[in-house]
Amino acid sequence: MRTDFETLRELVSGFSAGSATRPGEPTSDGLAGSRPRPPLDCQAPDVLVPGPQEAYPYDLHQTFERRSSSTSYGTEPLEAEPLLGMVRDALADDARTWGEDAEACPLEPFVLLLRPSGAEPGIYRVRLDGVDLVRPLPEAEVIEGMTVQKEFARAGAIVSVAANLDEADTWGGAAGYRFTMSRSAALIYSLHLRAVARGLVGTVFAGFATSAVRHLLDSDGVSRHQMFAVTIAS
């Protein structure tokens, strides 16, 4: 296997090349604090504050015992508030577990509500203290192009967790990336098991195609990179 660092540098440089409104800036120099990421432009901030979750019907052991495989997703709508509450709780677990280190490299979950009840379909961002509507859903073909497999776009929702790799690099260099990737995977698997414990199904996958969400989720691959994802359905 060949390790071509020059090609990697060109890719990273391209991701951070800027746009018509924001000039490009260097990355991986340990100075993330001097170039804070611009705020995400949300269509409707604070559209929902999920309430406390009801008790799960199954504990972790029972959840593992009950798991089974399926080749298709159910077509019933997903209740939006419980789903968004599960995402928030998984994010809160990450914050409690890692404390100051989580604050240095915060995670940012996005939820594509494809077939919800109790909320409008759209792209949402989940925070510890609320939920923002980022924008409406794109066309179905666009969603299919974002995912690894087209059938993922037929789920009730897709949850992706993003991170600022520039901040992770400043925090710990290469270890910062591994730390952030591990936490992203833990959050997604935590959400997956919460969903399964409520009788839902889903598929964990490696995340959205970066080029497909560059504008849709304001993800340049450096200051915001979609790390890991999961589908959720009835």
For the regions a protein language model found, what residue spans apply to each?
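Short, surface-exposed loop/helix-turn segments at secondary-structure junctions
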Residues: 172-176
